[in-house]
Amino acid sequence: MNFSESERLQQLSNEYILGGVNSPSRSYKAVGGGAPVVMKEGHGAYLYDVDGNKFIDYLQAYGPIITGHAHPHITKAIQEQAAKGVLFGTPTELEIEFSKKLRDAIPSLEKIRFVNSGTEAVMTTIRVARAYTKRNKIIKFAGSYHGHSDLVLVAAGSGPSQLGSPDSAGVPESVAREVITVPFNDINAYKEAIEFWGDEIAAVLVEPIVGNFGMVMPQPGFLEEVNEISHSNGTLVIYDEVITAFRFHYGAAQDLLGVIPDLTAFGKIVGGGLPIGGYGGRQDIMEQVAPLGPAYQAGTMAGNPLSMKAGIALLEVLEQDGVYEKLDSLGQQLEEGLLKLIEKHNITATINRIYGSLTLYFTDEKVTHYDQVEHSDGEAFGKFFKLMLNQGINLAPSKFEAWFLTTEHTEEDIKQTLKAADYAFSQMK
């Protein structure tokens, strides 16, 4: 494929935009470098770049675009609302309608508030939990990404009894001292942290199904024990469902797994492609938030009518019969095809799949923990990524990320993807 115009625009972008990208994950640093492809438009399962190349897209904006690009129903809703106004700074009926649809789908959201991103949603749930418990420390699990606010950019200490250290320049040590990081799926480490820190722990922050070191399910009983241990300690359980809400079924992962948190943060998919975030949970906890309580959260753009309208339209698409069954079927076809090719070419790789989402890891281990992904073969992934890209398959440029199917992918797309993977693997021996 020819990428000359992307390369020219990336050079121009470097003159005006820091690093040439507005989010570091868009660079190709993790896959050996080079100019990232500059996209021009998207329709359904496909993206088209500035050089005229067409791609089958499995990045899907890192997850939000579950109905494909420029879905007609959602696009029409956005256009209609834009003609009526995009921001009023007042309540609208759309906020009520969208909140009701969300609570009908996720019953634990007894009360809801909207913000503008997943980062804001998680940041605010932590504040609310601290206000409710009158404690300061939180526990999170290694490898899970909860946005770019200071409190969650903290690396693990040497064990559950050790405090974290800043995972980014600009995060104060004083903030890092409020965070304990333990391995996901390691209930003994979680018990040790709770026993050591006791009544200092306000909340534990959990991705019920991990989406940020690939797709990783909780081990049987893990989430149930986290709930039990937390509540016996007076610690709240916060689920970060920014990736998982409406990803696997019409609702949240918590309902699929049958384990209910005290608070939930959500975002990505529910905005229909527009910026959105939100949080909700038990009414008595949510009543800590202003104007009813002392925990302050506000936002000029929060609950804006354009995002509300897009979210309503998105849910109208997802609540139709057969949507998630199709995603699961296509995901199964993709997984089975890749596994056959891995065996055919004697590639060291494994796959985690959850319905219409999967991750290909260049390792010989079944992945259940972050450390396994960290030690997987990044060089092999980088080579695979570029071999696929040059055949018109767009993946996330990181070994830690997932492939996302949409309602608009087809069996023919899967066949073309497997044909490309067959060639890519043949070049990796």
UniProtKB/Swiss-Prot annotation:
Top-level taxon: Bacteria
Organism: Staphylococcus aureus (strain MRSA252)
Protein name as it appears in the record: Glutamate-1-semialdehyde 2,1-aminomutase 2
Pathway where this protein functions: Porphyrin-containing compound metabolism; protoporphyrin-IX biosynthesis; 5-aminolevulinate from L-glutamyl-tRNA(Glu): step 2/2
Protein location: Cytoplasm
Subunit structure and binding partners: Homodimer.
UniProt keyword Protease, yes or no: no
Gene from which this protein is expressed: hemL2
Cofactor(s), names only, from the UniProt record: pyridoxal 5'-phosphate
E.C. number(s) listed in UniProt: 5.4.3.8
GO biological process: protoporphyrinogen IX biosynthetic process
UniProt xrefs under Pfam families: Aminotran_3
Modified residues (N6-(pyridoxal phosphate)lysine): 268
Catalyzed reactions per annotation: (S)-4-amino-5-oxopentanoate = 5-aminolevulinate
GO terms assigned for molecular function: glutamate-1-semialdehyde 2,1-aminomutase activity; pyridoxal phosphate binding; transaminase activity
Main location: cytoplasm
Family label: Belongs to the class-III pyridoxal-phosphate-dependent aminotransferase family. HemL subfamily.
Keywords: Cytoplasm, Isomerase, Porphyrin biosynthesis, Pyridoxal phosphate
A GO CC term assigned to this protein in UniProt: cytoplasm
